[in-house]
């Protein structure tokens, strides 16, 4: 008997959805940053084992949109809960249910498939706090399963996989067993660069950056030559991203190159520039060019 199913992970921004996905896959597939709303595009990630295949749709955190990109992110996350076989609602025990959580719960009540409540960061919170949070959420809605985990340390991840297998239906293998992600290499490379930029930049340059891959070529020796732009919205952001004497941009390139080489399993030469594109997050045509799907 072979089972297969589509799973979506939902939760407030910065709750650890990307970290959980990476822990399940044991791969660095989804951008991880300490800043909320860093996952911007639905990434279908595929986990194939001997007797099942799980297709994960990694979604942005649900939040009140402030621009076209924000509207897309919220719509994307909401639509991801439709036409799936299982929903994982990820929360942190150290935070009481806020407006965002209550908004998600109202949406989850309309879902016709099993919903798991997954408590992240249990290693960082006392058992009493975890138990209190469990009680609070259990009173808000009924969940098929409640699983405490530590995505960062991998605690109870195998248990979570076992329970997901239990609930998904019998079905075909949708993707080849060696395929782990349905996005192209350029998209992944851009996300890696963006993650490094978010980690290294100060709060003066929050989410108003994107990465545009201009060129990605592989020579006869197997080395990738990559060129790209880091897009920002304000002229004042440009020198911050570049840094004194180009130091910040150099660090972004160095750190990104290491992860890109691990991803492509090849030597990489990368060159980045910083370009100002005012209000790019409200530019629908540019958002489409940058890979944000279903923009209308």
UniProtKB/Swiss-Prot annotation:
Pfam families per the UniProt record, alphabetical: KH_2 (PF07650), MMR_HSR1 (PF01926)
Keyword ATP-binding appears in the UniProt entry: no
Location of the region described as G2 in the Swiss-Prot/TrEMBL record: 37-41
Region G5, residue ranges: 149-151
BP GO annotations: ribosomal small subunit assembly
Residue ranges, annotated region (G1): 11-18
Keyword Oxidoreductase found: no
GO cellular component: cytosol; plasma membrane
GO MF term set: GTP binding; GTPase activity; ribosomal small subunit binding; rRNA binding; small ribosomal subunit rRNA binding
Gene3D superfamilies according to UniProt: 3.30.300.20, P-loop containing nucleotide triphosphate hydrolases
Chain ranges of the KH type-2 domain: 201-278
Ranges where the record places region G4: 120-123
Subcellular location: Cytoplasm; Cell membrane
Domain Era-type G: 3-170
Positions that bind GTP: 11-18, 58-62, 120-123
Family listed: Belongs to the TRAFAC class TrmE-Era-EngA-EngB-Septin-like GTPase superfamily. Era GTPase family.
Subunit details: Monomer.
Protein's name in the database: GTPase Era
Gene: era
């Amino acid at each position: 008997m072979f089972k297969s199913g589509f799973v979506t992970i939902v939760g407030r921004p910065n709750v650890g959805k990307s970290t959980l996905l990476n822990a399940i896959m044991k791969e660095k597939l989804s951008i991880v940053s300490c800043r909320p709303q860093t996952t911007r595009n639905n990434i279908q990630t595929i986990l194939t084992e001997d007797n099942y295949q799980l297709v994960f749709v990694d979604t942005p955190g649900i939040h009140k949109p402030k621009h076209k990109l924000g509207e897309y992110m919220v719509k994307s996350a909401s639509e991801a809960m439709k036409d799936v076989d299982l929903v994982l609602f990820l929360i942190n025990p150290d935070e009481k249910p806020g407006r965002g959580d209550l908004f998600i719960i109202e949406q989850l009540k309309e879902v016709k498939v099993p919903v798991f409540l997954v408590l992240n960061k249990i290693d960082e919170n006392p058992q009493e706090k975890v138990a209190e949070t469990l009680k609070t959420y259990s009173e808000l809605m009924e969940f098929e399963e409640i699983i405490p985990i530590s995505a960062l340390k991998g605690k109870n991840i195998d248990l979570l996989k076992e329970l997901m297998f239990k609930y998904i239906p019998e079905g075909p293998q949708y993707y080849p067993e060696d395929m782990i992600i349905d996005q192209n290499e350029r998209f992944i490379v851009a996300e890696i660069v963006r993650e490094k930029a978010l980690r290294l930049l100060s709060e003066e340059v929050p989410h108003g950056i994107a990465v545009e891959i201009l060129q990605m070529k592989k020579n006869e020796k197997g080395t990738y030559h990559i060129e790209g732009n880091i897009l920002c919205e304000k002229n004042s952001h440009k020198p911050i991203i570049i840094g004194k004497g180009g130091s910040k941009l150099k660090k972004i390139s160095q750190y990104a190159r290491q992860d890109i080489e691990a991803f492509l399993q090849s030597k990489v030469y990368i060159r980045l520039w910083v370009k100002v594109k005012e209000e790019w997050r409200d530019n629908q045509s540019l958002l489409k060019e940058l890979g944000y799907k279903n923009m209308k």
